[in-house]
């Protein structure tokens, strides 16, 4: 049976639909909903069976932890055993917002939700629809991104319906999300806070607030024997159906390299997609070219990344070449997602031309 789709925004809430969605969560069902980052696939975080349903619907490995979403700061103390001072400072500054913190879990949180770990990842989203749903659903909603595991995360309800329409109970359509990349994840179970996933709240912002904060060295791990402490650390994520490579180097060299690679692929009968910027989109030939935005507007690049990857799926391209996007504030987050989507395939434009 197809999921029921209901439309609403934070400015135009449908409280009857919210109550119905909350009842679905309380009964152990699954509801996809908008947040300020990407769409989430929600289940009752305190119900082990609901968490297992999330893993099954997504085709997600069960050792990949789920983030527990709350809608009231006081709820944090119910699902954790310790809240370090640094975590309290970040919560006061960045919650509600695109920040997830990993803390020691209380017994009330089942291991099915935490991927077998003694820690729990917690977030307080700023989206009003998300907040009202969490309250209606009992206060604790486990929610990874609402997509088939490994695929680009959904930034519109249509993406959710495409991936999970037959596997879940309801989709709340809140329009296109604001940020377009998942939340920053900070681990407070170590001596020094560690960023396990970069996001809108950058390492520099965290260091300005707390002082010593580090970036995890394992952000690029793919070793199957490693147990991930946070969503997205171990498994390939965000990937389009076509083979994706990132071309790095000076702009002129990148354009020449992508055009040459495109020409070679077209000669082999392949359909090519190119992820460009507003500044370069007219310079590519023989390819389906999609601009991800201007290099002067990095938040726009982040906002459009997953949408562009899904658009190329719709266009049925065989191979995708992308420029690199090492922008000042969100470059870490953007390139983290792009590298994972490409399986870390990088082409050096300078070396290619030799």
Language model features: what each stretch is:
Residues 1-354:
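Active-site-adjacent structural elements in enzyme catalytic cores
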